Amino acid sequence: MKPIQVIDSHTEGNPTRVILSGFPIPKNKTLLERVNYLKKKQDHLRKILNHEPRGNGMMCSVLLMPPMIKGCDYSVIIMEQDEYVPMCGHCIIGTATTLVYAKKLKQKKSPVTIKFHTLAGIVECKVHIKNGNVDYVSFVNAESFLLHQNYKIKTKNYGKINVDIAYGGDYYAIVSADKLKIKLNLQNDQEIIRCANEISTEMLKKKFPHPKNKKINRCYMVQFISNKRIHNKNNSKTTVVAPPGAIDRSPCGTGTSARVAQLFSKGKLKLNQKFHNEGPLGTKFIGKVISSKIENKILYIRPQVSGRAYITGIN
């Protein structure tokens, strides 16, 4: 097997590993077919890249490929600890930062525009450069929406819980940590994971088909929210738990998209109003709704999320 060349970064605390070469690219015609091929034939490579000893508990890898559709710069497959996900915000910010760092783009003038073809749709990034270095990245995410309010589930140790189910490139069960009296700090990680796993187990018992893509139908991500913030200038604190129990160190890009969709649908966020979403480490993403529309009684929004990434290694 050829060596796999990667560049590592972290986005507001959460790692991304961008694959530049050495990884066999599937030859299937559609992005979904390529993902399914990797699941069946090459999943060992995902584990090699993401798991110990080469990876860690939150490592995510991004496979860069030539664009499969017109109007995009790259098609990408996003590989997490346990899943191939439709979209990942912190990975997109890390990937955009990596491409500028590695001088893989023709455009030099800030902001540099990059369009990624993901399973969730086309994601457009703008990389803002200051003094020759990446300052921050903004991306316009796939259409996001609130699917269910106060969806009731019953858990073993936490009783009946009301969750909001929102989509921001992936489905999230959004839960009030304050109501459950769960403290969102790193010292309380085991209780956070335990509760998230109980919620995720219940959510996976039912499918939630995406109104426009029935193949997206599983809600396995859990997003805890709280008003008890580290920095008072931020609007809310969040902790996202991904299967099989990994805490996202960043405020989570798709989770932020789902959150602003939830707030906008409830009338708690206005168009173009900035929402400062604080993660477990006190770092933040800034989300806002840049457009909205109603189709078949569902309010869809187009979210923009901004954050920063930093190069940590070349391997």
Q: Residue spans of the language-model regions?
A:
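Glycine-rich ThDP/TPP pyrophosphate-binding loop and its adjacent helix/strand module
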Residues: G169
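A glycine-rich beta-to-alpha transition motif near the start of alpha/beta enzyme domains, typified by
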Residues: M1-D164, S176-N315
